Amino acid sequence: MSASEGISLPGNEETTPPHEKHKQKAKKAKKKSRSAKESVPNAMDAKATASYFSLSIVGQIVSATFPLGPDKEFVFLRYEMVAGPDWQLSSGPQHGLTQLATNRRGHFNEPIVFNMPIEVTYKSTSPYGWPQILVTVFGRSGLGRETLLGYAHIHLPVFGSRRPADQTEQLQAPILMPKCPNMMADITSWLLRREPELKDPKVLLDNLKCKGLSMESYGSLQFQLSSVMRGARKLGYHWHS
């Protein structure tokens, strides 16, 4: 029989009681859970970093004005929100149609009031392709015949939170009417009693595409728009009014 068999040498024996071992394991498990919880907010903070900014627009298309009066008895507008590929419409309608309006009861060059509300929100990662409002102006005669009166477009404002004293300030956009390219087209337009129309009015929003168009201005549209922007500074965009 060797001396080591059946004999517990000093230093080889375990002095920790079983209930103390259980407490130590519980403490280690708590430390691991705490470290895991502390690492989760850091990952969430990384994901919460702003990846886009938002632009909210509230306002209205107020009225249309023609210096010598409109050619038709009634006028109505059709508008469309147009933006670049980096912009996404989060809320609000992309298209809209106003009611029929007239100024025949007043002076011929008085504003034709629409007060068409506009409320949209966009989000984007880049200011390229800043949103615009493209408006097509139509006229309707007493017999129900509709003809084109022109086009208008305007960029949504970057800054629009006005002070109370400036709330009556309005933005204006000229109403543009296409001209016939030659005499034959002019005669055809006169015989058919129809003004020339653009196949795709969005070409007016691109300076390169509308360079060769012949347009004339007749009248203007009045807008009242205010804007609220969020998250632009986090992406490094600093605009100053």
Swiss-Prot record:
Phenotype upon loss of function: Viable and fertile. Results in lack of localization of the tectonic-like module proteins, namely MKS1 and B9d2, to the transition zone resulting in minor defects in sensory cilia.
GO cellular component: ciliary transition zone; cytoplasm; cytoskeleton; MKS complex
Keywords linked to the UniProt accession: Cell projection, Cilium biogenesis/degradation, Cytoplasm, Cytoskeleton
Annotated InterPro entries: C2_B9-type_dom
Ranges where the record places region Disordered: 1-42
Subcellular location: Cytoplasm, Cytoskeleton, Cilium basal body
Comp. bias regions, Basic residues: 20-34
Span of domain C2 B9-type: 53-197
Any one GO BP annotation for this protein: cilium assembly
Annotated function: Probable component of the tectonic-like complex (also named MKS complex), a complex localized at the transition zone of primary cilia. Required for ciliary structure and function.
Record-stated family: Belongs to the B9D family.
Protein name per UniProt: B9 domain-containing protein 1
Organism this protein belongs to: Drosophila melanogaster
Lineage, opening ranks: Eukaryota, Metazoa, Ecdysozoa, Arthropoda, Hexapoda
Gene that this polypeptide is encoded by: B9d1
